[in-house]
Swiss-Prot record:
The gene is COL1A1. Glycans are attached at residues 95, 938. Residues 28-47, 109-125, 143-161, 209-259, 368-394, 403-422, 464-491, 530-557, 614-628, 641-668, 697-713, 742-751, 761-776, 838-853, 908-922, 956-989 have a biased composition (Low complexity). Residues 59-73, 923-937 have a biased composition (Basic and acidic residues). It comes from the Eukaryota. GO terms for cellular component: collagen trimer; extracellular matrix; extracellular space. Type I collagen is a member of group I collagen (fibrillar forming collagen). The lineage of its organism: Eukaryota, Metazoa, Chordata, Craniata, Vertebrata. This is Collagen alpha-1(I) chain.
Length: 1022
């Protein structure tokens, strides 16, 4: 009976598992770690003869990845809630707006030189140069000294020979008697060796005077003097012309690889990837039986973030579960936090009508409805059997401006958001019966808000599909433009009191994401007519993780739509003439929320039917999938107030339904007769919190590494409802960026020093309370900036994570008007995973963000490709081995992307000078803590300093005589830093890691901007 507590029925089988989505875009890179300490220089070896320059040595191997950080303590899990009813597959999220790429971080200073690598093997000697042309002949030697004269007289003794030449034989003795004639001088000897002139022979003693006889015959000619020694070598000819350039010697063997370089600092986080394209809706499964509603679990204490798990492979979609028996109506569970609003899915074709549901218990009386215009009396229409859920249709073009929608329920207070424009006050919705409490939603990280998609055509209401397996939660779609105020809908029949859903286990607290770049405001879409409140469908399985989209522009605050009672939708029939108001009929079971059907011509307003008698309590039906908003019917007369039911416990927040497609504004129906004013109904249960507002765009990320200059404050996002303040986050370790070091003196290209090991990745601190702006910190040395890494694969979409690092404090946002309490619908199960869309283009670079408080060191980013070697420089003169040159300048920092999930902390590196705490930024929107995303792929380690390029071989010199090897020369000055290589190519994304631990449920964020009103839903049963 109305107000009674029903016994929960058996739990139905879960629906089929959703198909795995395509892999998401790569996740963001990690933060840049501090520079490693410089290694000690190796001892220099003796200087050998310089060979031709060998090829440049290879860069040292990258250092090992840092050790994983300590996993956070796991918070105590909350009580496990019962499994929610399976719902139809959720519609895939729309493509998120591509965020702006952060500005390139300032070029880091060169890190200290690492230890000198082992000297490379000396290159082979080059082939000797060709011999130069023969030198000119030397000058002819001067003639040698004349040989000694022959001895005078017969007995003249031969003159002493010059030192080189032998002494000529003595002339024959003369006949005694007259003095012989002087012998002729011997022929000129060959040129002597510049030896001393031979001593002139002493004249022989005169012979005894003979009798004067006849003159003797002249003495024989003396023998020619011996050939003088060779003259001194002629003067060296002028140097020959240089010989033709000899062929280059064979390339010397590559130098031995230097010592393993320290890991480079992690690259700057990559830009947030674009939201993946909207996936096709999965097939509609068979509706599973409703499970028993469990009691709502209390929220467990927030646990520390657990270690990031490796992502598991997506499971296969299970077959549809058999339809279970409907469970008995349960007591409404306590109100849970509102889930995120999903993106509108495409409208599916009209499904065939389903079986008529059993009559449900009389629901709690609804609040007094708005008085509608009197309708012309008509015959009582019969309730048609519910039709099967149609497949999700594709979003159609934006509809015409619709009427202003009713205000949604007020969400839990979120953190203080940036000042935004005040939202429009929503109209009070018709309270519905409390729905069954669904399981607690998973914590997901706040996804980037995508641009509003065009409103699709209204689909027909389809049957409820089987609940898919929990998939990855897609990114939240962008807030749509504010819709026009909708006409008050007819008061629905109170639905059955749903059984309380089980309380979900408390997820762990996810790592806080960085505040994304503030996107430009999205264009205001046409104002669609306010749709009639649709039935809350079960939340589909989470879709496969889409690539993290860039932060979309904050949309205008939309009016939350009503949450209609879930009833099995019947086929859309022609609207009959309103009959006389009958007795209130028994409330039907919550139907599946069908997709929005095509907008039909407005029918005449029906007269209120006779109130039917309360039927027997039917079993609680399964939570229907949330369909697109149906056409908004003409306002009906207010129904009589029902009996006050027992106050239901606060239910868990319902899953955020997908925003309905904007429906075309229907024609105004003829005014119906004014119905009697019913007595005021009891105060309805507090509705589930409205959909979370779009997350305000964060300011652009600062430069990688130590905190850079203060960035622009992003435009304030829409003001959300004030939420409970989050716990202050710990101060991180990030220091200020140091100035660039001076370039060392030029030397021969030094070996590539291995970079120091990366510092441990600090834990990401939760946003702390707004603190005063600190003085600028002492700049620390800039580490080598890695190439922009590929965006890592996105992790599972968890619930909204903690706010990112606080940005600059913004003005307090204006409190938007609180919406009236809407109907409290049961939260649906998680929808099926949406297909990940292709990553969007990188956004333009944002200005550097303000220095945030240092966060915990992030995990190393993915290793980037090695940079190309620089051009070869001219050969240097062979000098003594120089000291290791300083590490080349770091490459430009890549665009800073979203912060990936914190990976394991690497080994602690030398802590840089800690900069003062930056100005405390405004508290980010407190998102629901998402499940721990997949661990981002390893960030780029940064390039090792490139070895200075080898110069081209010089022209071979003239071959001179080999001199004795001289002693090793003194050690030369350190070589100049090599020119930085080009940024390497982005590495391929790494494999998706297993899914991380479940994150905690975060507090509800502020009410987001109103989404585009959906098209009017089909008229309800009379």
């Amino acid at each position: 009976s109305a107000g009674g507590i029903s016994v929960p029925g058996p739990m139905g089988p879960s629906g089929p598992r959703g198909l795995p989505g395509p892999p998401g875009a790569p996740g963001p890179q990690g933060f840049q770690g501090p520079p490693g300490e410089p290694g000690e220089p190796g001892a220099s070896g003796p200087m050998g003869p310089r060979g031709p320059p060998g090829p440049p040595g290879k860069n040292g191997d990258d250092g090992e990845a840092g050790k994983p950080g300590r996993p956070g303590e796991r918070g105590p899990p909350g009580p496990q809630g019962a499994r929610g009813l399976p719902g139809t597959a959720g519609l895939p999220g729309m493509k998120g707006h591509r965020g702006f790429s952060g500005l390139d971080g300032a070029k880091g200073d060169a890190g200290p030189a690492g230890p000198k690598g082992e000297p490379g093997s000396p290159g082979e000697n080059g082939a000797p140069g060709q011999m130069g042309p023969r030198g000119l002949p030397g000058e002819r030697g001067r003639p040698g000294a004349s040989g000694p004269a022959g001895a005078r007289g017969n007995d003249g003794a031969a003159g002493a020979a010059g030192p080189p030449g032998p002494t000529g034989p003595a002339g024959p003795p003369g006949f005694p008697g007259a003095v012989g004639a002087k012998g002729e001088a011997g022929p000129q000897g060959a040129r002597g060796s510049e030896g001393p002139q031979g001593v002139r022979g002493e004249p022989g003693p005169p012979g005894p005077a003979g009798a004067a006889g006849p003159a003797g015959n002249p003495g024989a000619d003396g023998q020619p003097g011996a050939k003088g020694a060779n003259g001194a070598p002629g003067i060296a000819g002028a140097p020959g012309f240089p010989g033709a350039r000899g062929p280059s010697g064979p390339q010397g063997p590559s130098g031995a690889p230097g010592p393993k370089g320290n890991s480079g600092e992690p690259g700057a986080p990559g830009s947030k990837g674009d939201t993946g394209a909207k996936g096709e809706p999965g097939p509609t499964g068979i509706q599973g039986p409703p499970g028993p509603a469990g009691e709502e679990g209390k929220r467990g204490a927030r646990g520390e973030p657990g270690p990031t798990g490796l992502p598991g492979p997506p499971g296969e979609r299970g077959g549809p579960g058999s339809r279970g028996f409907p469970g008995a109506d349960g007591v409404a569970g306590p109100k849970g936090p509102a889930g995120e609003r999903g993106s509108p899915g495409p409208a599916g074709p009209k499904g065939s009508p389903g079986e008529a549901g059993r009559p449900g218990e009389a629901g709690l009386p609804g609040a007094k409805g708005l008085t509608g215009s009197p309708g012309s009396p008509g015959p009582d229409g019969k309730t048609g059997p519910p039709g099967p859920a149609g497949q999700d249709g594709r979003p159609g073009p934006p509809g015409p401006p619709g009427a202003r929608g009713q205000a949604g329920v007020m969400g839990f207070p979120g953190p203080k958001g940036a000042a935004g424009e005040p939202g429009k006050a929503g109209e009070r919705g018709v309270p519905g019966p409390p729905g069954a409490v669904g399981p607690a939603g998973k914590d997901g990280e706040a996804g980037a808000q995508g641009p509003p998609g065009p409103a699709g055509p209204a689909g027909e209401r389809g049957e409820q599909g089987p609940a898919g397996s929990p998939g990855f939660q897609g990114l939240p779609g962008p807030a749509g433009p504010p819709g026009e105020a909708g006409k008050p809908g007819e008061q629905g029949v109170p639905g059955d009191l749903g059984a309380p859903g089980p309380s979900g286990a408390r997820g762990e607290r996810g790592f806080p994401g960085e505040r994304g770049v503030q996107g430009p405001p999205g264009p205001a879409g046409p104002r669609g007519s306010n749709g009639a409140p649709g039935n809350d469908g079960a939340k589909g399985d989470a879709g496969a993780p889409g690539a993290p989209g860039s932060q979309g522009a904050p949309g205008l605050q939309g009016m939350p739509g009503e949450r209609g009672a879930a009833g099995l939708p019947g086929p859309k029939g022609d609207r009959g003439d309103a009959g006389p108001k009958g007795a209130d009929g028994a409330p039907g079971k919550d139907g599946v929320r069908g997709l929005t059907g095509p907008i039909g011509p407005p029918g005449p307003a029906g007269a209120p039917g006779d109130k039917g008698e309360s039927g027997p309590s039917g079993p609680a039906g399964p939570t229907g999938a949330r369909g697109a908003p149906g056409d908004r019917g003409e306002p009906g007369p207010p129904g009589p107030a029902g009996f006050a039911g027992p106050p239901g416990a606060d239910g868990q927040p319902g899953a955020k339904g997908e925003p309905g497609d904007a429906g075309a504004k229907g024609d105004a129906g003829p005014p119906g007769p004014a119905g009697p004013t019913g007595p005021p109904g009891p105060i309805g249960n507090v509705g589930a919190p409205g959909p979370k507002g779009a997350r305000g765009s964060a300011g652009p990320p600062g430069a990688t590494g130590f905190p850079g200059a203060a960035g622009r404050v992003g435009p304030p996002g829409p003001s959300g409802n004030a939420g409970p303040p989050g716990p202050p986050g710990p101060v991180g370790k990030e220091g200020g960026k140091g100035p660039r070091g001076e370039t060392g003196p030029a030397g021969r290209p030094g070996e590539v020093s291995p970079p120091g090991p990366p510092g441990p990745t600090g834990e990401k601190g939760s946003p702390g309370a707004d603190g005063p702006a600190g003085a600028p910190g002492t700049p620390g040395p800039q580490g080598i900036s890695g190439q922009r890494g590929v965006v890592g694969l996105p992790g599972q979409r968890g619930e909204r994570g903690f706010p990112g690092l606080p940005g600059p404090s913004g003005e307090p946002g204006k409190q938007g008007p609180s919406g009236s309490s809407g109907e409290r619908g049961p939260p649906g199960p998680v929808g099926p995973p949406g297909l990940a869309g292709p990553p969007g283009e990188s956004g333009r670079e944002g200005s550097p963000g303000a220095e945030g408080s240092p966060g915990r060191d992030g995990s190393p980013g993915p290793k980037g490709d090695r940079g190309e070697s620089g051009p070869a420089g001219p050969p240097g003169a062979p000098g003594a081995p120089g000291a290791p040159g300083p590490v080349g300048p770091a490459g430009k920092s890549g665009d800073r992307g979203e912060t990936g999930p914190a990976g394991p902390a690497g080994p602690a590196g030398p802590a840089g000078a800690r900069g003062p705490a930056g100005p405390q930024g405004p508290r980010g929107d407190k998102g629901e803590t998402g499940e721990q995303g997949d661990r981002g792929i390893k960030g780029h380690r940064g390039f090792s300093g490139l070895q200075g390029p080898a110069g081209p071989p010089g022209s071979p010199g003239e071959q001179g005589p080999s001199g004795a090897s001289g002693p090793a020369g003194p050690r030369g000055p350190p070589g100049s830093a090599g020119s930085p290589g080009k940024d390497g190519l982005n590495g391929l994304p790494g494999p998706i890691g297993p899914p991380g631990p479940r994150g905690r449920t975060g507090d509800a964020g502020p009410v987001g901007p109103p989404g585009p009103p959906g098209p009017p839903g089909p008229p309800g049963p009379p």
